[in-house]
Amino acid sequence: MSRKSTYPKVMCTQHPDSASRYISTQEEPGEAIEAAVVFGCDEYMPDYEGKATPYHQNVQIVSRLIEETDLVPGKDVFITPRAPSAVQENRFRQLMVMMSIAEANHGALEYSDVQAINEFVHPMTGTVREILDAQQHMVDVSELAKKEFGFAMEVPRIIPLIEDAPALLHAKELTENTLLAWKERFGTVPEKFRVFLGKSDSALSFGHVASTLSCKYAINGLSELNFELETETGIVFGAGTLPFRGHLDLKNAENFFREYRGIGTITLQSALRYSHEKGDAEALVDLAKEKLPEIPELFSAEEKEELVNLIGIFGTRYSLIIRELASTINRLSDLLPQQRDRLMHRGSGGYSRSAPDISGIVSLCRTDIGKELLASMPAEDLHLPRAIKFTGALYSIGLPPEFIGTGAALNEAREKLGDEACERLLTKYFPSLVSDLNFATGYLDLNVASRFLSGACFKEVSKDIEILHETLGLETHPEPSYRILLEMMQPELLQAGTSGNCMDEEVSQLVCSTLTKMGKIRKALG
């Protein structure tokens, strides 16, 4: 990178992906202390996005850090809330979170001259206007705090979270245009500016391979900005432990840090802290502090063009299958446990994730590839569950989503882009792909999966697996205990998957218990 990063290295988050532990909002301030003192994280993200987090949680965390530790919030450990989107949820909730940021900073400045909260995350970002409007709200709240309480704080800076594949492909342009417009609106340009890239939602919409390539395309573009602009850009990369959501765990750490060179901060989510072996999370934190940031790999114009066409091909093949599975995924996801206090899925306080606008990908793809991608998209939004439960549902029927569309897309890429493009995919663009798929084979059971799929859908999935075995030499090595649980629960799971949740309470509890046990075996809910 062009400059030495001074950003935090490990952001502890409140993602509900632990299979072994439910954590209430009342426990989360203590969790923040644990993140810093036990796990060694240098950043914690109170999460208000689609979540019933009390507004005063920011204040509680900052106060407890001051009272119970020797750590100085804003210096030794950073508190970086994720505020709700004014577009996807509502502006009132966003403003209330911003007021709590001001209150937390007011309390911290009574103990020291260090401001506790200096940044906040804005989810599902798609436009410059969203970013600037949210930043303006923070400016307005800061001015109100100064007027009403007589204290001046440095206005916390927004971290846009980019979560879908089309936006990831335009992350560089979005960031550059934001910084140019920032100067016009606020009169200055920030010295530092972080961008948060999400692996999970882009995988949900476009599949594992297209998601990974989109994230790497975004990392490449944002790294280029570090050489082109005065502002120092930093990258937060959000990843879970299963491959579909990023494959960030201790065993895969070497692959992960090589794959995503250029990022400056990782997320340490709940599954790694509570569902993996004791000591794994601490070891990964130490490793991240040692390695981050690594020098990014920059792609040529020709390589970027090839990446986009690969994204289009893999996204198409994934989308054609996933839309056939939507109803099954939704029914099964309802049976997976809630591990955090979520808002309702739909309504004034919650939201559902809908299909992204793919014009940003189609316009970059080769014409024939773009047309096929466009045609593969469902006519109506599928309203799929959040990424963790989406992933967990597919793992729970013996069909890890990493496989969906991947084999057919690999063959199609070879036909349309050539053998050399496929070779570059496996050796340069996504060298960890084979490792990811080998991990997922431990939870693959086509016999079980067939009971949830239509005949045509099962034929396509079987073809994917066959191609991957032949092309990549994958070896299926099912986890014995996992397979037993899959087989044992089939009648009840099939009922849940095809007939709605019309089961008595005793059977429902048995199904939920077994799904949770499977999550514990794979060390993540999803």
Curated annotation (Swiss-Prot):
Cofactor(s) the protein requires to work: Mg(2+)
InterPro entries, per the entry: PEP_COase_arc-type, Pyrv/PenolPyrv_kinase-like_dom
Entry's transmembrane regions: none
Domain of life: Archaea
Signal peptide region: none
Catalyzed reaction equations: oxaloacetate + phosphate = phosphoenolpyruvate + hydrogencarbonate
Any one GO molecular-function label of the UniProt entry: magnesium ion binding
UniProt cross-references to SUPFAM superfamilies, sorted A to Z: Phosphoenolpyruvate/pyruvate domain
Subunit structure: Homotetramer.
HAMAP family: PEPcase_type2
Similarity field: Belongs to the PEPCase type 2 family.
Protein name: Phosphoenolpyruvate carboxylase
Gene symbol of the encoding locus: ppcA
